[in-house]
């Protein structure tokens, strides 16, 4: 997290003229129009809804800058400092105090109008605007999100164990433990489970901002082509998404995990090519493990083939583990 404790809790440390903070929330869509089908041989992954459409950091900053220009046209000597997600302040803490919504047990701000499917941003200003009142927390005894979390990352009271959270894990660049890979499933970036099950999000689907309208082929992309794109092609396809901020490594790793989840025999040749030609250890290791999960004769033969060419000891060990699964299981 950015900044010191003082900077994250005392706005005047960031903006000496601070008198008030304006918090904004923009709703984003939750349903894909004309979503492409996920079929055998053409398997697809899914980006979380926070990464549909144009990068929300860009859009919210644009809205805040326009708001600042409007206020400046009405008030002399207006000054402000704009933040969207990457600033020192906690967007959620600011939004909660501003009355945008309350902090739910799913660690999200829940609004009356739009549920928790909102992006947050704020500006510190030198104008003493009248403060709004916080919204009452109405989660009550409900614990649907806590029980639904795939990894048990949500703790009672709206706290989150980030090291268990699939959204956080999907953005890391390391090899994932097998139990986390199984839980990740077809997720390429982020996780929406704790929001989708929330009663306040029932039938919530707002298409109010054109920039957030998703391209179905980007939000739910084919998996195999994700492993065959050059850096330039990958950026052209996904570079405008907020989910691209960590680069292509986590996304390609997660695409491989998704192919393993589907036990997609049609991906064997692509995975073999990754193992033999890619230079990234995590990507190669994940591909080896994927061949071990697919459990088909073609996948076993591919492992035999790569075992003859791979020379790195850690990868040789992974190949042996993958082949051992074939000796233990049934090949389809």
What label would you give each PLM region?
Residues 1-138, 315:
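Auxiliary alpha/beta "docking" domains used to position bulky ligands
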Residues 110-134, 161-180, 231, 235:
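Short, charged low-complexity linear segments at domain edges
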Residues 131-140, 181-191:
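Immediate flanking context of iron-sulfur cluster ligation sites
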Residues 144-167, 187-211:
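Iron-sulfur cluster-binding cysteine motifs and their immediate structural context
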Residues 171, 244-247, 276-282, 305-316:
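Short coil turns that connect the paired helices of HEAT/ARM alpha-solenoid repeats
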Residues 216-248, 253, 257:
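Glycine-rich phosphate/pyrophosphate-binding loop
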Residues 233-238, 264-276, 296-308, 330-332:
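Amphipathic alpha-helical scaffolding segments comprising HEAT/armadillo-like alpha-solenoid repeats
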Residues 252-264, 273, 284-296, 316-330:
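Structural detector for internal amphipathic alpha-helices that build alpha-solenoid repeat scaffolds
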């Amino acid at each position: 997290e950015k900044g010191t404790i003082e900077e994250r809790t005392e706005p005047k440390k960031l903006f000496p003229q601070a008198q008030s903070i304006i918090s904004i929330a923009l709703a984003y869509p939750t349903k894909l129009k004309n979503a492409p089908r996920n079929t055998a041989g053409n398997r697809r992954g899914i980006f979380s809804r926070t990464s549909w459409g144009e990068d929300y950091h860009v859009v919210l900053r644009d809205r805040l800058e326009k708001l600042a220009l409007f206020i400046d046209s009405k008030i002399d000597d207006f000054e402000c400092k704009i933040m969207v997600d990457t600033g020192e302040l906690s967007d959620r803490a600011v939004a909660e105090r501003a009355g945008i919504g309350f902090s739910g047990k799913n660690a999200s701000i829940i609004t009356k109008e739009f549920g928790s499917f909102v992006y947050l941003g704020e500006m510190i200003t030198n104008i003493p605007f009248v403060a709004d009142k916080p919204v009452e927390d109405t989660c009550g005894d409900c614990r649907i999100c806590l029980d639904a979390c795939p990894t048990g990352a949500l703790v009672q009271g709206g706290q989150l164990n980030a090291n268990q959270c699939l959204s956080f894990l999907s953005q890391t660049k390391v090899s994932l433990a097998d139990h986390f890979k199984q839980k990740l499933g077809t997720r390429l970036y982020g996780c929406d489970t704790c929001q989708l099950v929330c009663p306040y999000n029932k039938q919530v689907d707002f298409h109010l901002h054109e920039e957030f309208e998703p391209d179905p082929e980007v939000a739910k992309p084919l998996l195999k082509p994700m492993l065959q794109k050059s850096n330039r092609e990958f950026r052209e396809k996904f570079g405008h998404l907020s989910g691209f901020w960590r680069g292509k490594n986590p996304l390609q790793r997660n695409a491989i995990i998704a192919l393993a989840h589907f036990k997609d025999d049609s991906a064997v040749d692509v995975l073999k090519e990754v193992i033999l030609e890619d230079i990234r250890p995590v990507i190669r290791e994940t591909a080896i493990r994927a061949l071990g999960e697919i459990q088909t004769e073609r996948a076993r033969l591919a492992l035999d083939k790569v075992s003859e060419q791979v020379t790195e000891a850690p990868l040789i060990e992974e190949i042996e583990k993958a082949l051992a699964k074939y000796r233990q299981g049934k090949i389809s």
